[in-house]
C-alpha cells in the first residue's frame, strides 16, 4: 500500500510504500536520503512511486483524520510548512516516554500483548519479522507516564487566618503556596507540589512556622462548588462573551465548564502564563473534584509530556493552556474557551506561524464542538462577525465598582520631571487612602532614547537600526533588539553637541517616584528585572499584601491583573502608542488603555489618570467612555476604506540580507511576479537594520487567500527567495 507522508520539520511530502497498513495521522520513521526522518501519514496514495521506506512506526495514532485535516488547513492558511505544523501536535521529548509492545492480531497466539524486549527474548527477531509480514502481530509504541501509585492522600490546610499570615516574612515560593491554598484549602499535597513545582522543603518550612498542616486521608467529601447560576444563555456553535472587566464573564465561563466537563474535556486557552496561574487557582477552588491539566512553555519536559498524554488519553476534565495547547489532540473534546481573545500573544510570529484563535475556531468546526471567545475588547475579525450575526454575542455589564478617569493635558499642566503635578497629587491622595498605585510606562530603561540637543542625532545600535536605551543601574546604553551594550559617550559623535535623554522609561519613572515619595515602597516590573512568570507573580503577591505601594511596569502589568486594592492606575506617554507606525496601532492602543483601566475597576471606587498631549484624540476619548462599540464602528469604517483587516487579508513577506540592495531587489522581483495583485512596497522595515542584517518587506492585500498564497509560494520557489511570510499578523512591527 502507498501513502503520502509529511516529513517532520519541513514542507516535504513523500510517497511511501508500506507492506503494513498505516493509520492516518500515525507517526512513522522513514529511511530517506541515507538517513532517517520522522513523518506523519496523510492519506492513501494512488501513485506507486516509492520515495522512502518505513523502518519504524508508532503502531497507533493520537491524531484522528480531523486533526490531519486541521494540520493541512493550518499549513495552507498560514503559509507554514506542513511537517512543522504536525510537529506542533506533539511535545518535544515525547519519545523518551515510550516502550514498544508486540500486539497479537491472531486468536491462535497465546498472548494478547507483551513488551518488545520480552518477545525478542522468547521468540527472536526473525520470528517477529515473519509474524509481522503475515499479519499475526503488530508492533506499537505504548506511551507511558509515571504516575504515583494509589495511596492515602495527604491534604494541606492553612492553620492561620490570612490576616495573621500577612505579618509573616515569607519567601516567594512560600507565598505562592499560601495564595494557592486561599483558593484550594485541603488540596492533596502531591497535587499542590505538582501544580506549583515547589519542593517539599517549602511545605516543611511553612509547617514549622505553624502556617499549614498536613492531614492524611479524605477528610471531607469532594464536591463541585455551587455556582451562582446567573448565566442562563444557551450557547451556539460560535459565541462571543463581550463585556468590561468585572462584568461576570469569568463566572459564566465557569458555569459552562461545570456543564461541559460532564460531557468530555474542556480546552481553556489563555494568552499568558501569568493569566493561567490565576485562572488555575480559581478553577481548582470552584471545582475541587475536576482533573485539571495545564500546558505551557514553562513546564519541565517530563511534566509537559505527562500533561499532554493525559489530555490525549482522555484522563482529564479540563486542559488549561497557553497558545501551544490549541494543538494538543484532546480526546473527547466537549468545549473550547478562549479568554482575552484579543491578545496578540495568541499569534505565533516564528515559523511555523499561526493564529491560535483562528485554529481554535477551525477545531470547533471540524469536531463540531462549541467555542466561547471572551474579551472586553474583542479582536476586530471576531467583532465584525458578531455584528453580522455569524457569531452569537452575549453582552455583559459591570456589576460592581465604578471608575473615575481624569485626563491630564500635558500642554497646559505644571510638570515635575516625567509627571504632571496633578498626577503626583492624585498618587499622594491614593496612598493616603491606603490604596495601591499602578503606573504603566511603555518603555523599559531610564531614557527611551539618547539624542543630541543641537543636531537631533539619536544614538543607535551598530547592528540594528534601533535607538539605544540608557540604563542608570549599569550606566550603559543597551539595544533591546540584539542585547548589545555600549559604554556612555560624553558628546554627540556627529557634531559634538550635548546629549540628553528623551522619553522616560520605567527606570527613570521609578527613580523619580522614589524621590517624590521617599517613605513609600516602590517597585519596577519589566523584562530587565523579571526573567520568569514566578518572579512576576511575586511582585503581584507583594502588591496584594501591601508590601508594595507603587508598582511601575510595562505591558506585563496590564495582563489580567486582578487586585482590588489598586486605587489608581496611571498611564504615561500614551501618545507614543497612538502614533506608532503600524496600521493596527490605534486598535492596540485602545485595547491596552481599556485593559489597563480595567485594573482600576476591580475595587469599590477605582480611579485612573492619563497623561497626554492629545486629550481630544478619539482613541483616548472612546477608551475613557468605555465606548467599545463606538470606537470599533469608527475603526471598522477606517479599515474598510483603506482595505485592511477584517475586510481584506494582509500577507507580510519579509527578507533580510547583509547587503541592503540584495533584499530590496529580491522583493522587487517578487512584486513583478505578483503583477495583478495589490502589493505595497517593498520598503525598508522601520527597524531597518537588526543584528547586522538589513530588512525589507512588502505587503499583499487580498480578499482571496486561496488564490494568492499558492501564487506566492510558486513565486518564492522560482525566484529562490528565503522569506518570512506572515498571514494576518496582529502587527507588522515584530522583529524576525
Curated annotation (Swiss-Prot):
> For this protein, what does the record note about how its cofactor is bound?
Binds 2 zinc ions per subunit.
Broad enzyme group: isomerase
Residues annotated to bind Zn(2+) 1: 452, 455, 492, 495
> Which GO terms label this protein's molecular function in UniProt?
3'-5' DNA helicase activity; ATP binding; ATP hydrolysis activity; DNA binding; zinc ion binding
GO CC terms: primosome complex
Q: Which residues form the Helicase C-terminal domain?
A: 487-643
Top-level taxonomic group? Bacteria
- Residues bound to Zn(2+) 2: 461, 464, 479, 482
Q: Which residues form the Helicase ATP-binding domain?
A: 230-396
Required co-factors: Zn(2+)
Which E.C. number(s) belong to this protein? 5.6.2.4
List membrane-spanning regions. none
UniProt motif DEAH box: location: 339-342
Q: Where does ATP bind?
A: 243-250
Q: Which UniProt keywords apply?
A: ATP-binding, DNA replication, DNA-binding, Helicase, Hydrolase, Isomerase, Metal-binding, Nucleotide-binding, Primosome, Zinc
Q: Which reactions appear under catalytic activity for this entry?
A: Couples ATP hydrolysis with the unwinding of duplex DNA by translocating in the 3'-5' direction; ATP + H2O = ADP + phosphate + H(+)
The UniProt record lists the keyword DNA-binding: yes
Any GO BP annotation: DNA replication initiation
Q: What InterPro entries does the entry give?
A: DEAD/DEAH_box_helicase_dom, Helicase_ATP-bd, Helicase_C-like, P-loop_NTPase, PriA, PriA_3primeBD, PriA_3primeBD_sf, PriA_C
Homology family: Belongs to the helicase family. PriA subfamily.
Function, as annotated:
Initiates the restart of stalled replication forks, which reloads the replicative helicase on sites other than the origin of replication. Recognizes and binds to abandoned replication forks and remodels them to uncover a helicase loading site. Promotes assembly of the primosome at these replication forks.
Q: How does it assemble?
A: Component of the replication restart primosome.
Quote the NCBIfam families the UniProt record gives.
priA
The identity of this protein, by name, is: Replication restart protein PriA
Q: Which organism is it from?
A: Thermotoga maritima (strain ATCC 43589 / DSM 3109 / JCM 10099 / NBRC 100826 / MSB8)
Amino acid at each position: 500500500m502507498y501513502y503520502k507522508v509529511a516529513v517532520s520539520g519541513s514542507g516535504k511530502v513523500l510517497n511511501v510504500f508500506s507492506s503494513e497498513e498505516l493509520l492516518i495521522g500515525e507517526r512513522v520513521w522513514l529511511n530517506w536520503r541515507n538517513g532517517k526522518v520522522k513523518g506523519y501519514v496523510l492519506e492513501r496514495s494512488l501513485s506507486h512511486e516509492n520515495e522512502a521506506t518505513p523502518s519504524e512506526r508508532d503502531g497507533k495514532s493520537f491524531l484522528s483524520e480531523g486533526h490531519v485535516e486541521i494540520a493541512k488547513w493550518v499549513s495552507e492558511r498560514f503559509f507554514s510548512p506542513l511537517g512543522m505544523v504536525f510537529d506542533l501536535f506533539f511535545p518535544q521529548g515525547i519519545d523518551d516516554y515510550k516502550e514498544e509492545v508486540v500486539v497479537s492480531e491472531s486468536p491462535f497466539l497465546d498472548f494478547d500483548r507483551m513488551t518488545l524486549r520480552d518477545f525478542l527474548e522468547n521468540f527472536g527477531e526473525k520470528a517477529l519479522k515473519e509474524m509481522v509480514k503475515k499479519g499475526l502481530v503488530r508492533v506499537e509504541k505504548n506511551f507511558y507516564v509515571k504516575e504515583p501509585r494509589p495511596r492515602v492522600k495527604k491534604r494541606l490546610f492553612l492553620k492561620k487566618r490570612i490576616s495573621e499570615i500577612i505579618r509573616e516574612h515569607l519567601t516567594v515560593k512560600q507565598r505562592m503556596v499560601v495564595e494557592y491554598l486561599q483558593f484550594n484549602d485541603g488540596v492533596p499535597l502531591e497535587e499542590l507540589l505538582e501544580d506549583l513545582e515547589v519542593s517539599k522543603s517549602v511545605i516543611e518550612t511553612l509547617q514549622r512556622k505553624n502556617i499549614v498542616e498536613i492531614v492524611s486521608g479524605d477528610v471531607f467529601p469532594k464536591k463541585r462548588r455551587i455556582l451562582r447560576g446567573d448565566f442562563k444563555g444557551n450557547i451556539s456553535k460560535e459565541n462571543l462573551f463581550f463585556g468590561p472587566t468585572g462584568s461576570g464573564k469569568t463566572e459564566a465561563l465557569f458555569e459552562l465548564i461545570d456543564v461541559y466537563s460532564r460531557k468530555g474535556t474542556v480546552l481553556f486557552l489563555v494568552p499568558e502564563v501569568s493569566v493561567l496561574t490565576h485562572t488555575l487557582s480559581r478553577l481548582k477552588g470552584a471545582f475541587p473534584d475536576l482533573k485539571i491539566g495545564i500546558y505551557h512553555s514553562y513546564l519541565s519536559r517530563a511534566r509537559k509530556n505527562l500533561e499532554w498524554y493525559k489530555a490525549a488519553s482522555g484522563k482529564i476534565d479540563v486542559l488549561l493552556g497557553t497558545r501551544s495547547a490549541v494543538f494538543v489532540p484532546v480526546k473527547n473534546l466537549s468545549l473550547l474557551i478562549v479568554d482575552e481573545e484579543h491578545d496578540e500573544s495568541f499569534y505565533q510570529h516564528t515559523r511555523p506561524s499561526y493564529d491560535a484563535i483562528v485554529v481554535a475556531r477551525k477545531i470547533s468546526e471540524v469536531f463540531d464542538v462549541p467555542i466561547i471567545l471572551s474579551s472586553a475588547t474583542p479582536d476586530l475579525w471576531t467583532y465584525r462577525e458578531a455584528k453580522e450575526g455569524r457569531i452569537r454575542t452575549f453582552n455583559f455589564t459591570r456589576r460592581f465598582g465604578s471608575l473615575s478617569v481624569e485626563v491630564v493635558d500635558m500642554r497646559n499642566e505644571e510638570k515635575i520631571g516625567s509627571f504632571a503635578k496633578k498626577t503626583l497629587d492624585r498618587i499622594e491622595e491614593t496612598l493616603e487612602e491606603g490604596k495601591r498605585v499602578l503606573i504603566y510606562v511603555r518603555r523599559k530603561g531610564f531614557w527611551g532614547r539618547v539624542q543630541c540637543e543641537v543636531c537631533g542625532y539619536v544614538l543607535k545600535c551598530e547592528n540594528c537600526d534601533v535607538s539605544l536605551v540608557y540604563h542608570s543601574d549599569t550606566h550603559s546604553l543597551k539595544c533591546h533588539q540584539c542585547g548589545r551594550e555600549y559604554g556612555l559617550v560624553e558628546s554627540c559623535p556627529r557634531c559634538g553637541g550635548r546629549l540628553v535623554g528623551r522619553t522616560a522609561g520605567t527606570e527613570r519613572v521609578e527613580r523619580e517616584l522614589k524621590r517624590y515619595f521617599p517613605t513609600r515602597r516602590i517597585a519596577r516590573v519589566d523584562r530587565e528585572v523579571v526573567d520568569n512568570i514566578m518572579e512576576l507573580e511575586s511582585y503581584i503577591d507583594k502588591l496584594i499584601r501591601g508590601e508594595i505601594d507603587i508598582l511601575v511596569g510595562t505591558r506585563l502589568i496590564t495582563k489580567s491583573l486582578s487586585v482590588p486594592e489598586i486605587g489608581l492606575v496611571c498611564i504615561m506617554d500614551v501618545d507614543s502608542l497612538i502614533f506608532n507606525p503600524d496600521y493596527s496601532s490605534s486598535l492596540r492602543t485602545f485595547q491596552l488603555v481599556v485593559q489597563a483601566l480595567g485594573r482600576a475597576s476591580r475595587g469599590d471606587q477605582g480611579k485612573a489618570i492619563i497623561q497626554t498631549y492629545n486629550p481630544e484624540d478619539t482613541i483616548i476619548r472612546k477608551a475613557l467612555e468605555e465606548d467599545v462599540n463606538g470606537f470599533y464602528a469608527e475603526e471598522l469604517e477606517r479599515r474598510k476604506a483603506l482595505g485592511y483587516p477584517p475586510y481584506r487579508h494582509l500577507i507580510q513577506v519579509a527578507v533580510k540580507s547583509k547587503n541592503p540592495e540584495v533584499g530590496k531587489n529580491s522583493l522587487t522581483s517578487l512584486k513583478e511576479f505578483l503583477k495583478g495583485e495589490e502589493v505595497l512596497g517593498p520598503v525598508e522595515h522601520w527597524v531597518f537594520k537588526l543584528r547586522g542584517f538589513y530588512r525589507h518587506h512588502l505587503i499583499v492585500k487580498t480578499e482571496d487567500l486561496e488564490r494568492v498564497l499558492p501564487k506566492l509560494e510558486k513565486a518564492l520557489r522560482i525566484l529562490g527567495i528565503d522569506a518570512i511570510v506572515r498571514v494576518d499578523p496582529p502587527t507588522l512591527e515584530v522583529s524576525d
